[in-house]
């Protein structure tokens, strides 16, 4: 009798690590994008929490007038924020080793850059991880495509806009009231409400909410009952079942009669593609709009008032918007400049043609 001994091939530590990283059997999929995502998001989150609680005031305008944003310096959850990097830094890369000391780094708002850049790397890696997991499971890649919309929006306000404006101090502060301040100043300087891409984004967000509510309520209202009247309808559903869980024909008939026939989808794939594409495409457009306004290609501007035959101004809604924009522009960075750019850049008007003669 001949005995055959098979020699087991030893698997290296690196191969075992690669197998574990790319395994779809893990409770949470890691993936190669996850190797980048985990440290960057942990770094951004840790720095954000510490800065929101305890960061010292930041000289955001670069004029030696620090602005406090942390809880320990008198703010609350609503007013608190991580203040953007100083205007004195501009768009220079400002890691902690570029400063003379940690105190200087904190004074110039270094944590803002650290948080924002790690956050953007992290969410981009999360997006890549969605594609990677879909690929390994044999799924189509549309989940990652949909998530690209919020990634594009975040990149626009945190990275592209500061680069276009020439300073990270123009980026969105990392806090509730700071976000609102950013929105008001953005409107004042770029008239974003009159930009067609922003209008598309508003329609995408509100329309997406409406369509999501309509779809969820229609599906929930047309579930196929597999249980008795005394049991919950939900008990009739088995996870992974092949049978339809709701009656799309009934939902289509209901909605077609509620609005009109062609307002309703009778194809489930077309319906779900529309539900995904409507907000995603429009948020892409909004991010593109912010990108164009970063380089001062602004919303529609109606600076010329409507006048009658005698030259008197006939006030329109555009005049009200312009006046509100000027007011907001005057209010922000009040100590950095005395007049908004729209006024300061105008033609100089003589106050007096000649000085009066003074007789002693």
UniProtKB/Swiss-Prot annotation:
Reactions performed catalytically: 2 a plastoquinone + 4 hnu + 2 H2O = 2 a plastoquinol + O2
Residues of the site described as Stabilizes free radical intermediate: 190
Residue numbers binding chlorophyll a ChlzD1: 118
Major localization class: plastid
Transmembrane segments: 29-46, 118-133, 142-156, 197-218, 274-288
Official protein name in the record: Photosystem II protein D1
Misc note: 2 of the reaction center chlorophylls (ChlD1 and ChlD2) are entirely coordinated by water.
Post-translational modification, as annotated: Tyr-161 forms a radical intermediate that is referred to as redox-active TyrZ, YZ or Y-Z.
UniProt entry keywords in alphabetical sequence: Calcium, Chlorophyll, Chloroplast, Chromophore, Electron transport, Herbicide resistance, Iron, Magnesium, Manganese, Membrane, Metal-binding, Oxidoreductase, Photosynthesis, Photosystem II, Plastid, Thylakoid, Transmembrane, Transmembrane helix, Transport
Family of the protein in this entry: Belongs to the reaction center PufL/M/PsbA/D family.
Assembly mode: PSII is composed of 1 copy each of membrane proteins PsbA, PsbB, PsbC, PsbD, PsbE, PsbF, PsbH, PsbI, PsbJ, PsbK, PsbL, PsbM, PsbT, PsbX, PsbY, PsbZ, Psb30/Ycf12, at least 3 peripheral proteins of the oxygen-evolving complex and a large number of cofactors. It forms dimeric complexes.
Gene Ontology biological process terms from the UniProt entry: photosynthetic electron transport in photosystem II; response to herbicide
One term under GO cellular component: photosystem II
UniProt-listed Gene3D superfamilies: Photosystem II protein D1-like
EC number: 1.10.3.9
Functional description taken from the UniProt entry: Photosystem II (PSII) is a light-driven water:plastoquinone oxidoreductase that uses light energy to abstract electrons from H(2)O, generating O(2) and a proton gradient subsequently used for ATP formation. It consists of a core antenna complex that captures photons, and an electron transfer chain that converts photonic excitation into a charge separation. The D1/D2 (PsbA/PsbD) reaction center heterodimer binds P680, the primary electron donor of PSII as well as several subsequent electron acceptors.
């Amino acid at each position: 009798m001949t005995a055959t001994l098979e020699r087991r091939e030893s698997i290296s530590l690196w191969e075992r690590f690669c197998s574990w990283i790319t395994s779809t059997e893990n409770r949470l999929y890691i993936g190669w994008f996850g190797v980048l995502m985990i440290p960057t998001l942990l770094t951004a989150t840790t720095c954000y929490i510490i800065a929101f609680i305890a960061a010292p005031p930041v000289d955001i305008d670069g004029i030696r007038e620090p602005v406090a944003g942390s809880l320990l310096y008198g703010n609350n959850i609503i007013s608190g924020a991580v203040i953007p990097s100083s205007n004195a830094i501009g768009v220079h890369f400002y890691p902690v080793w570029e400063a003379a000391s940690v105190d200087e780094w904190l004074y110039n708002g270094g944590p803002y850059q650290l948080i924002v850049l790690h956050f953007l790397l992290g969410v981009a890696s999360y997006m890549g991880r969605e594609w990677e997991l879909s690929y390994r499971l044999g799924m189509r890649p549309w989940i990652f495509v949909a998530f690209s919309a919020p990634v594009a929006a975040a990149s626009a306000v945190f990275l592209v806009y500061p680069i276009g404006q020439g300073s990270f101090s123009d980026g969105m502060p990392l806090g509730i009231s700071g976000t609102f301040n950013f929105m008001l100043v953005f409107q004042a300087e770029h008239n974003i409400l009159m930009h067609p891409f922003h209008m598309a984004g508003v329609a995408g967000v509100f329309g997406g909410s409406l369509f999501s509510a309509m779809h969820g309520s229609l599906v929930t209202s047309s579930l196929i009952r597999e249980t008795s009247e005394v049991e919950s309808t939900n008990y009739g559903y088995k996870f992974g079942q092949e049978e339809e869980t709701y009656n799309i024909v009934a939902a289509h008939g209901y909605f077609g009669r509620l609005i009109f026939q062609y307002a309703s989808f009778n194809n489930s794939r077309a319906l779900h593609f529309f539900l995904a594409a409507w907000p995603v495409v429009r948020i892409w457009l909004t991010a593109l709009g912010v990108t164009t306004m970063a380089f001062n290609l602004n919303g529609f501007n109606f600076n010329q008032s409507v006048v009658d035959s005698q030259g008197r101004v006939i006030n329109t809604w555009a005049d009200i918007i312009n006046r509100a924009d000027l007011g907001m522009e005057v209010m922000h960075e009040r100590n950095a400049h005395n007049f908004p750019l729209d006024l300061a850049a105008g033609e100089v008007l003589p106050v007096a043609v000649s000085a009066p003669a003074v007789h002693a």
